[in-house]
Curated annotation (Swiss-Prot):
Keywords: Methyltransferase, S-adenosyl-L-methionine, Transferase, tRNA processing. GO terms for biological process: RNA (guanine-N7)-methylation; tRNA methylation. It comes from the Bacteria. Residues 1-17 have a biased composition (Basic and acidic residues). Substrate binds at K145, D177. This is tRNA (guanine-N(7)-)-methyltransferase. The active site is at D141. Its EC number is 2.1.1.33. Pathway: tRNA modification; N(7)-methylguanine-tRNA biosynthesis.
Length: 236
């Protein structure tokens, strides 16, 4: 798998950039999973997408969900095991994260996950219209410096891209412990006629939704006293 070195100050506004492509050196078995298991699960978006995203999976899924930037994969793996007839697409450009989800897929014999190691914006453009029931973005890179805000995933263009692929009634769910990025996300979604924030009272965004699997990063943030917001937006 090739790496692309990126200049964080370069204006690359068409790219939804998450962060580093590779971190710690992979252990031998992790490298073997990247070499031998990933090719069987990786989506190839060079060709035309299927007319129905459920057909990405074999057997065909009852519906399809996407997790963007799944990190260590704890949430993605748990959701796939809890909803066995749903197909899950995990998007993660960080090689170490990809190795971690592959290990969980192997250990749990999980058959309903497909993976994409590239740019989420390209994946969203490839997927059929109204093909997803849900998109999750959990603890994304907040890019705290003002000059890097253009690299945050939540932008007007990505909101429009998500609106295109979500079914009416589908949801975009966002979890973040950085207040500024939460406010950024709320303000950007408020500008879109395609989404409605579902919170009716404070606990609706202060507490995880039912069945939420806490990630390793989420537990670390809680230990350090950072409170996350759990935002849900319905495609209208």
């Amino acid at each position: 798998m090739s790496e692309r070195k990126s200049d964080p100050d370069r204006d690359d506004s068409e790219r939804a950039f998450f962060g580093r492509r590779k971190g710690h050196k992979l252990r031998q078995h992790q490298a073997e999973l990247i070499d031998h298991l990933l090719p069987h699960l990786a989506l190839d978006i060079a060709g035309e997408a299927p007319g129905n995203a459920c057909e990405i999976f074999d057997p065909a899924a009852s519906d399809v969900r996407l997790e963007i930037g799944f990190g260590g994969g704890e949430h993605l793996a748990a959701e796939a095991q809890n909803f066995a007839t749903t197909g899950f697409i995990g998007c993660e450009p960080y090689v170490n994260g990809m190795a971690k989800i592959l290990a969980q897929i192997e250990a749990g014999n999980i058959a309903n996950i497909r993976l994409f190691a590239g740019d989420a914006a390209e994946l969203l453009a490839w997927l059929p219209k109204a093909s997803l029931s849900r998109i999750d973005l959990i603890h994304p890179d907040p890019w705290p410096k003002r000059r890097h805000w253009k690299r945050r995933f939540v932008q007007d263009r990505t909101i429009a891209a998500m609106a295109r692929v979500l079914k009416v009634g589908g949801e975009f769910r966002f979890v973040c412990d950085i207040d500024d990025y939460c406010a950024w996300t709320l303000s950007h979604l408020a500008r879109s006629a395609d989404f409605k924030w579902l919170a009716e009272r404070a606990d609706d965004f202060r507490q995880p939704w039912d069945g939420y699997t806490m990630t390793r990063y989420g537990r670390k943030a809680a230990r350090e006293g950072r409170k996350a917001a759990y935002l849900r937006f319905r495609r209208s």
